[in-house]
């Protein structure tokens, strides 16, 4: 992708970068509106994700995570921006007339052909079961349950690695560093998710961040005691506690939030790296 750097004509455009080749012109039959109750709250109105709210209205793009157009070749027609994820998406025209969106594999260009099935080439963008892949294959959009669609390694730049196959299971190393078992019958897509340099892009101004629905992050130590346990004091005072805490008084910075005795505990061979 071509990254365009704006000239320093105004403070808002100084060092701002955009991808000049990616457009946003979705097909009407592959989008639908969605009710945004957002702001990082759950059904009870409790904050579950901080610093969320506002942002531009979005139309949801229907992404084909299942890749169930078996043994039918498709051609990449467009590479588009998706406001609902940090990865780009591709519009695929299949030979039978079907049109679908998929995640954009890194290196794929307009005009490339892809296919999904059981005996397809090990080529970037092709989808096939893990049992038909050689060891060491880089993959993304990985199913956890067969037929449910890809659920792992879907973010921009994400890639997992097939490191072993034994019995009915395959061993994968996920982007987080976690090593876990998955059924060999589950499907995955060959290659890495595109838009690898998403973290190196510069938005240029605070307003661009607000368009994405991300609100400012305020440190607890500069708040009042009524707002945060770290708040209060004269000047730059210490937090007054042995360990940092959340605004609700729970331990912060590394507290484990995974449920105990989860069904998939016996499938995880090595926990993710911190």
From Swiss-Prot:
GO terms for biological process: mitochondrial translation. It comes from the Eukaryota. It holds the Pfam family Ribosomal_L2_C. Its main location: plastid. InterPro entries: NA-bd_OB-fold (IPR012340), Rib_uL2_dom2 (IPR014722), Ribosomal_uL2 (IPR002171), Ribosomal_uL2_bac/org-type (IPR005880), Ribosomal_uL2_C (IPR022669), Ribosomal_uL2_CS (IPR022671), Ribosomal_uL2_dom3 (IPR014726), Ribosomal_uL2_RNA-bd_dom (IPR022666). Part of the 50S ribosomal subunit. This is Large ribosomal subunit protein uL2cz/uL2cy. It comes from Daucus carota. The lineage of its organism: Eukaryota, Viridiplantae, Streptophyta, Embryophyta, Tracheophyta.
């Amino acid at each position: 992708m071509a990254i365009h750097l704006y000239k320093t004509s105004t403070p808002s455009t100084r060092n701002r970068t955009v991808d000049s080749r990616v457009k946003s012109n979705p097909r009407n039959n592959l989008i639908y509106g969605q009710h945004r109750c957002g702001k990082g709250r759950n059904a009870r109105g409790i904050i579950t994700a901080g610093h969320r709210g506002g942002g531009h209205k979005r139309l949801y793009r229907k992404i084909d995570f299942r890749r169930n157009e078996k043994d039918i070749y498709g051609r990449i027609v467009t590479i588009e921006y998706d406001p609902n994820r940090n990865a780009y998406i591709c519009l695929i025209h299949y030979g039978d007339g079907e049109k679908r969106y998929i995640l954009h594999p890194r290196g794929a260009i307009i005009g490339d052909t892809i296919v999904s099935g059981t005996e397809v080439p090990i080529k970037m963008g092709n989808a096939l079961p893990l049992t038909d892949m050689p060891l060491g294959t880089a993959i993304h959009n990985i199913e956890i349950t067969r037929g449910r669609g890809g659920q792992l390694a879907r973010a921009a730049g994400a890639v997992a690695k097939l490191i072993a196959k034994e019995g009915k299971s395959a061993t994968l190393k996920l982007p987080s560093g976690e090593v876990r078992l998955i059924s060999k019958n589950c499907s995955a897509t060959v290659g890495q998710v595109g838009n690898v340099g998403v973290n190196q892009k510069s938005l240029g101004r605070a307003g661009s961040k607000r368009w994405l629905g991300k609100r400012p992050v305020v440190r607890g130590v500069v708040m009042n005691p009524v707002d945060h346990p770290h708040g209060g004091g004269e000047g730059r005072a210490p937090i007054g506690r042995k360990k940092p805490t959340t605004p609700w008084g729970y331990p912060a910075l590394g507290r484990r939030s995974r449920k105990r005795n989860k069904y998939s505990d016996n499938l995880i061979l090595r926990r993710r790296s911190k």
